[in-house]
Amino acid sequence: MAHYKKFRLSTLAAVVGIVLAVGPENSYAEAPIQFNTRFLDVKDDASLDLSRFSRKGYIMPGSYHLQVLVNQSQIAQDNVITYSVDNNDPDNTYPCLSPELVSLLGLKPEIADKMIWINAGQCLQPDQLEGMETQTDLSQSTLTVIIPQAYLEYSDEEWDPPSRWDEGIPGVLFDYNVNSQWRHAEHDDGDEYDISGNGTVGANLGAWRLRADWQANYRHENDSEDKDNFGSSSEQNWDWNRYYAWRAIPQLRAQLTLGEGSLESDIFDGFNYVGGSLITDDQMLPPNLRGYAPDISGVARTNAKVTVTQRGRVIYESQVPAGPFRIQDINETVSGDLHVKIEEQSGQVQEYDVSTASIPFLTRPGQVRYKLAAGRPQDWDHNMEGGFFTSAEASWGIANGWSLYGGAIGEQDYQALALGLGRDLALLGAFSVDVTHSRATLPEGSAYGDGTIQGNSFRASYAKDFDDIDSRLTFAGYRFSEENYMTMDEFIDTHNDDNDRQRTGHDKEMYTLTYSQNFSAINVNAYINYTHRTYWNQPNQDSYNLTLSHYFDVGEVRGISLSVNGFRNEYDNERDDGVYVSLSIPWGNNRTLSYNGSFSDDNNSNQVGYYERIDDRNNYQINAGRADNGATLDGYYRYQASYADIDVSANYQEGDYTSGGLNIQGGATLTAKGGALHRTSVNGGSRLLVDVGDEANVPISGYSTPVYTNAFGKAVIVDVNDYYRNQVKIDITQLPEDAEAILSIAQATLTEGAIGYRRMEVLSGKKAMGSIRLRDGGTPPFGAEVYNSRQQQLGIVGEDGSVYLIGINPGERLQVTWEGKTQCEAALPDPLPGDLFSGLLLPCIGDASSPEATQPEEKPLLQLHTQRRTFSTQPEALSSRYPTH
């Protein structure tokens, strides 16, 4: 008998499985499929409800929760799509594509303007465009709109047209980066404490991003030898260094910014001002047309804090372990000179300047890029300086390979005009040249001089990729300035000087050379960065960084790395030279043995180290060795929590000092949809709030280490790229055994600074066999569906009311639906019995006309990317999800 029952089950499953396996079909039905219900060998074939399977591609009239895709690219995560009967063919239905949904399709403007609407303008008339069709897959809960590419705006694999950009939801945010360092000097038994931080407070209102940047510092020194004054001194400060707001203007491919800021320019030197700007945003362009960001490299002899500032404002701060470092995530909008400060835990400090001179200024033929600004200059303390100014610059792709660019900036007593030409030389690389002329009327008695002075500044840039030899040469930003040439920043300074002040740091000549080479035949990489600066009234400065890396194998040990790094930094009449040598040997899975040698004029050290990556979140390194002053010991530990990135470091130098450091970088985001503590990538930048209902500890991954939802089922993903098609997903390999991801993948293309929101779905609970009985003793028809209170489908009723249920919880109420509406409700026992596969008897109360039974406005179905698991006990009833093997 048991064998016969299993045979009947397999027959039922095969019939329904064949229908579901047909795949997505056009919403316009083809010839109906006739079912012979006697073939199913069911006692009461009149009770079967197979209407949803009877026509190939037919969708029953009603409303459904569906994912919407255009040519396989997701554009809407959870839309309510209404299917209506086609007046021209009563046997067919069509989906109502609303104006809001059609605006996301990415149609060219001239195509979208000609669309015809029906149902009082609420639905797109079907069959308007040749080749356009819709496909609905209820088993995957998706609606795919197929549109020929000729009707669509440009897009690529990771970039969407502006019509699909997401401005996000309203919310507030607080991002922070806090560094703490402690140092104990053995020679005087003194202690130093330093806590510094920076971050952003903000709010999003529609397309507007409101932001305020802050930075703070607290320093305390305790000298035990100064008994009378308790040997202590402290200093502290807190600054709100910038208040500003911005929004994207998609129609112009530009960003409008109001408030305080620094002049963004590819031609002129920057300065602080308050006002407004309208700037073409390269991030809004497809990825292959975007610009360049500065690259900062250096060497830390010990665990150190690296701070990058521009005109006093901190734009980057982080702790780095001993050895060479390279910072490549500076915002590409930063322009001008940057100041780098490396504070070693040993107490030593390195300082130097780097230039963000860009590669040759080229624009695609027919395109125009521009930057407009107006306002009043101001100092660090928000005080106005000088008069009202305006600034404008543009680059025009005049012909294939040629770009003309220039700009002007001025106020009442200062004007500057620039003109340049860029050329793509194809196989010979690319170059640009420009000249800037300045004219300034100086105030009487200025230390910079009297009267009107004029001067010129000349600049040239060159870049070349040598693909045949896998190398790149960039001669970026050669610049020569005449003695009387004056920047706007220098002119502003003339209004604040005193009679004893002299003009310092007056640039004469500067150039930066960067070269990288990969010698693949011998597994060697070379990188050179050299900067030379001369001044009219102070000594020259030179800095260079040379790195050679070699990768090789020895016997069964593979991936050995040998690196030599030489550097020189000159700043404020001081020179710092050094060589750093490192050898890294893999030692099993995720473990490495290393040797590090640091050699300079004032100190030499040799260390051996051990590194281990414990898991995706934890790694540490321990080093021990000897320096000129004695033994050394240091360690570094990093933990990537869901709520913050945490770095801990410690150093010991025999007879000299003991030190430690702590860095915490994180943020908090709060919206009407919920909020969470989280890691941060860029202060005040874009983020994606993921909502999985009330499920805690659900792993969500973007492009880096996964984060886990908090107690409220929320997580914030910060590793998202502006104007890219980002994808996040639930890591199903880390889900508990009683959890199943129903909606596990989401996509979003966010504008800069947006707080995106996506709902994902996890079904948690026990699995059980049940038997549903109606009030009159009968059973629901075959094919009836069972939902929970969150409208998640838990199972499909088989013969005799049997149903295999997943995701059930004690005391939960279940809704049983057929014929397009909820017919009755059943309650699960609390607590659930120990043996859930013996068959739960579930009385179903109510009928179509009773108060307990209500017709749902929408019909949630199986969601996109349903994940399935294999169960040890196979159900003997038709399930809404088939276990995989």
Please place each PLM-identified region on the residue numbering.
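Post-signal-peptide, soluble extracytosolic/periplasmic N-terminal scaffold domains
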Residues: 2-9, 15, 27-290, 602-669, ...
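A short, amphipathic beta-strand motif
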Residues: 68, 298, 688-692, 766-775
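Short, acidic Ser/Thr/Gly-rich low-complexity loop/linker segments typical of extracellular
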Residues: 84, 705-714, 791-802
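Short Pro-Gly-centered beta-turn/loop motif in secreted/extracellular proteins
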Residues: 88-97, 330-335, 713-736, 740, ...
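Extracellular beta-sheet/turn segments enriched in Thr/Pro/Gly and aliphatic residues
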Residues: 142-147, 360-364, 744-765, 829-864
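Conserved, compact domain cores that house catalytic/ligand-binding motifs in diverse enzymes
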Residues: 163-227, 368-441, 612-618, 624-629, ...
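Feature captures outer-membrane beta-barrel proteins of Gram-negative bacteria and organelles
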Residues: 165, 195-207, 231-250, 386-400, ...
